[in-house]
Amino acid sequence: DLNLKIFDLTHEIPPYNIWEGAYRLYQTASYWPQGSVFVSVVDPGVGTDRKSVVLKTKNGQYFVSPDNGTLTLVAQTLGIDSVREIDEKANRLKGSEKSYTFHGRDVYAYTGARLASGAITFEQVGPELPAKVVELSYQKAKATKGEVKGNIPILDIQYGNVWSNISDELLNQAGIKLNDTLCVTISEGSQQKYAGKMPYVASFGDVPEGQPMVYLNSLLNVSVALNMDNFAQKHQVASGADWNIDVKKCAK
């Protein structure tokens, strides 16, 4: 179909990192229109009995992926309309039946292209499954008086800024305002990796060079940075389902 538009969102997901694949889908999906078909293949279980599915979200988008946790965040934020298992007898690249390790090409890209072009309908993808997907466990963002807690899903890797899943709405619910002094604690599982004080400011230039700060990133989520330095590298902070952050008001 010469009218079909194909966009590469990224080929930079670290190998086997299902969590980062899940976050990048969440980060980008809302900018695309109803009817968009996303193909996401982070598939360390390729060739095993994990299911290959197409998720239709409540806003009318389609996500073609292994059902291994990749769909966690789009399912939670966009809502599940329905899920279908890919019928590989009907929706698999012809001649690839003996290939067990390249389902990205043989199953997912093939099915996604056929669905996006109208060669098949959503109903022709395969049998309908219960309206749920495999979900990764992580710290959901929450607010109490003077304090917010959440997960560190991703790093702004070029600059070493630490992004959380804590929204500006939750910050407001906690009563945290610009120029408040905040105590920030970052942990990997039960192990504390960082604890320190810093101001909540609008932008990087509001603190001296090399100093820490809390700010809102482009998604309007709570983030931590060093002005013109690399916070994640300096403090050995990473991201993922096991990385958590606690931010609360404290004395200067």
What positions do the PLM features span?
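Intrinsically disordered, low-complexity, positively charged segments
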Residues: 1-15, 22-26, 156-161, 166-170, ...
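A conserved acidic, glycine/proline-rich C-terminal tail/linker
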Residues: 162-236
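Active-site histidine-anchored catalytic micro-motif
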Residues: 2-5, 12-27, 32-42, 46-106
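Anionic-ligand-binding alpha/beta catalytic cores of soluble enzymes and soluble regulatory domains
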Residues: 94-178
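A structural signal for short, hydrophobic beta-strand segments that form beta-sheets
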Residues: 80-82, 151-157, 200
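Pepsin/retropepsin-fold aspartyl endopeptidases
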Residues: 228-230, 234-252
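Generic structural signal for buried aliphatic residues
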Residues: 38, 182-184, 213, 241-246
